[in-house]
Amino acid sequence: MSSRKIKEEMLEIIAPELYAPRHRRSVKAETKSRVKKEEIKSKRKWKRPQIDDLLTEDVEVVGATAPRRPYQWRGRKVKRVLRPGTVITFTPGVRSRERASKRSSDEIFADEDILEQYERGEGEFRYGKRSKAEAAVVLDTSNPTPSLHPVTPQMPIVHTSAAKRSAVPTVEVLAPKKRRFTESSDQLAVDMVTETSTVPPGTAVLLPARAVKQARRRFPVAVESKKPEHMVVEEVKVRDVKPVAPGIGVQTIDFKVPVDAPKPPVSITEQMDISSTPAKKVAYGPANKIIPVAWQHPSQMGFPKYVRPKRRRRVARRSKSTGRFVAAPRKRTPRRKIVLPAVRYHPSLDTVPRSQVAIWR
């Protein structure tokens, strides 16, 4: 029993909550003399006519379908996300004019895995037209030649005039499991450095393209067009029919096709005239013509780094001269034609501090 229930029981004994009935203003009721009517109720209860009763009276029911249930989103494991391609526009403060074209919730929202359902053909994509995939069953997967292993799967050869759900031949390519690389390795071992090469190996330098003044020479390239040769079959071996099912057998026919031996690579060297003189450098004008010299405020130039002051020797100070200090006349220069104006600052705004000051940033 909770503590709240205990407190309520204790309060009922000490201070019971008894409220008087609410006082309401009495309304004077008008009395009218009415004649009492006695209604005779029939003991037979009214019964809703069933569908079987209607059919007995030769009544045709048109469009008798069950009402569609609302989609139960509660309890689903997926989230409600927008369907791919759904456009929702919202302008704050502007009422939508398209009041008549309202879309349902199922049209806008969908499951989170809607694309995966489309791939698997589940959910709402379970019905409707779909492409029929031809299901093929391989009747025999045995290998009568153990020294060869299959390289490709069995591919069925279906003719256009073949009947539906009929047996069709298959083709499979097999290759030997172990190959002798002694002969092929001897053929591939070719000395890449030929006697006609003018540059010793490891000393060739690739010049940049801008250093070449002469145009590239176009060498004639011989293009040979070969006609497709017919496949050469060395040996054809017809094996016995292997029974697979009652009344069905599989017959294997082996075709031995020769494979061309790998040809060694051939190196071709050609001499080309390459100029080794570097290209001329482009001489640009002074940068002052592009970027004018401007005087910056000391606040824009930053502060010098802190340098530890060197140990100074004490020197006898000179006595101050009693003469009057006269400033030397400054030589005025004409104003430069720059974008920023020439400015003069107060002597207190000096770019070079008189003493080394440590500034902590």
Swiss-Prot record:
Biased composition (Basic residues): 311-321
GO biological process: viral release from host cell
Subcellular location: Virion; Host nucleus, Host nucleolus
Keyword Zinc: no
Region of interest called Disordered, as start-end residue ranges on this chain: 311-331
Induction / repression: Expressed in the late phase of the viral replicative cycle.
Keywords of the record: DNA-binding, Host nucleus, Late protein, Viral capsid assembly, Viral release from host cell, Virion
Keyword DNA-binding on entry: yes
Superkingdom in the source lineage: Viruses
GO cellular component labels: host cell nucleolus; virion component
Molecular functions (GO terms): DNA binding
Additional remarks: All late proteins expressed from the major late promoter are produced by alternative splicing and alternative polyadenylation of the same gene giving rise to non-overlapping ORFs. A leader sequence is present in the N-terminus of all these mRNAs and is recognized by the viral shutoff protein to provide expression although conventional translation via ribosome scanning from the cap has been shut off in the host cell.
Recorded family membership: Belongs to the adenoviridae core-capsid bridging protein family.
Role description: Associates loosely with the viral DNA to form an outer shell around the nucleoprotein-DNA complex and links it with the capsid by binding the endosome lysis protein. Dissociates from the viral genome during entry. Might be involved in nuclear capsid assembly of the viral particles through its association with NPM1/nucleophosmin.
Subunit details: Monomer. Homodimer. Exists in equilibrium between monomers and dimers in solution. Interacts with the histone-like nucleoprotein; this interactions bridge the virus core to the capsid. Interacts with core protein X; this interactions bridge the virus core to the capsid. Interacts with the endosome lysis protein VI; this interactions bridge the virus core to the capsid. Interacts with the peripentonal hexons. Interacts with host NPM1; this interaction might play a role in virus assembly.
Official protein name in the record: Core-capsid bridging protein
Organism: Bovine adenovirus 2
Lineage of the species this protein comes from: Viruses, Varidnaviria, Bamfordvirae, Preplasmiviricota, Tectiliviricetes
